[in-house]
């Protein structure tokens, strides 16, 4: 883990490309200028960072950070923390020591998730989708996707599908 150091990193997002791996925000994009928390991932084929909004960091992650880095010198052990403002450094150290992020940061992540849910709601259709298939005898089968049996299938005469040209 030569690139990852401790395996954890906190920084200000330089761009809007990363998506949050947390579920609290609905996996929304991490906007440029916001604080993000990364976990180093080494899959064998590639190495990368899995990013989360600071408000999406779970108590279990904070416990693992505390166990790996120790309580004594979090500021010197956590990658990227020294580039943050003193206010954010205090916030991060307090969260690691307490075992959870502050309520206000969690609220911000929940707001992102609510915005995403409102924007991504789809209109409900009145009828379920249908699948149309042709079998070997050129019969057209129309069947509801939701039905489990062929009892709902409708058969038509195959002669109308193939007329002389």
From Swiss-Prot:
Zinc finger PARP-type: from-to: 8-100
Gene Ontology CC terms, in alphabetical order: cytosol; nucleus
PROSITE patterns associated with the record: ZF_PARP_2
Domain of life, source organism: Eukaryota
Composition skew (Acidic residues), residue ranges: 149-165
InterPro entries (UniProt xref): Znf_PARP, Znf_PARP_sf
Residue spans of biased composition, Polar residues class: 117-128
Record field: compositional bias (Basic and acidic residues): 100-114
Molecular functions (GO terms): DNA binding; zinc ion binding
Cell location: Cytoplasm; Nucleus
Disordered: annotated segments: 100-165
UniProt keyword terms in alphabetical order: Cytoplasm, DNA-binding, Metal-binding, Nucleus, Zinc, Zinc-finger
Comp. bias (Basic residues): 131-141
Stated name of the protein: PARP-type zinc finger-containing protein C13F5.07c
Species of the source: Schizosaccharomyces pombe (strain 972 / ATCC 24843) (Fission yeast)
Lineage: Eukaryota, Fungi, Dikarya, Ascomycota, Taphrinomycotina
């Amino acid at each position: 883990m030569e690139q990852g150091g401790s395996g954890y990193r906190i920084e200000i997002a330089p761009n809007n490309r990363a998506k949050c791996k947390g579920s609290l925000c609905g996996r929304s994009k991490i906007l440029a200028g916001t604080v993000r928390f990364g976990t180093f991932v080494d899959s064998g084929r590639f190495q990368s960072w899995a990013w989360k909004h600071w408000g999406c960091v779970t108590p279990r992650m904070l416990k693992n950070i505390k166990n790996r880095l120790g309580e004594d010198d979090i500021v010197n052990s956590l990658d990227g923390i020294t580039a943050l403002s003193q206010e954010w450094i205090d916030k991060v150290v307090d969260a690691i020591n307490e075992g959870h992020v502050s309520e206000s940061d969690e609220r911000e992540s929940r707001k992102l998730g609510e915005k995403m849910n409102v924007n991504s709601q789809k209109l409900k259709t009145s009828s379920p989708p249908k699948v149309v298939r042709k079998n070997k005898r050129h019969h057209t089968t129309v069947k509801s996707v939701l039905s489990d049996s062929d009892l709902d299938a409708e058969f038509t005469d195959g002669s109308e599908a193939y007329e002389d040209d």
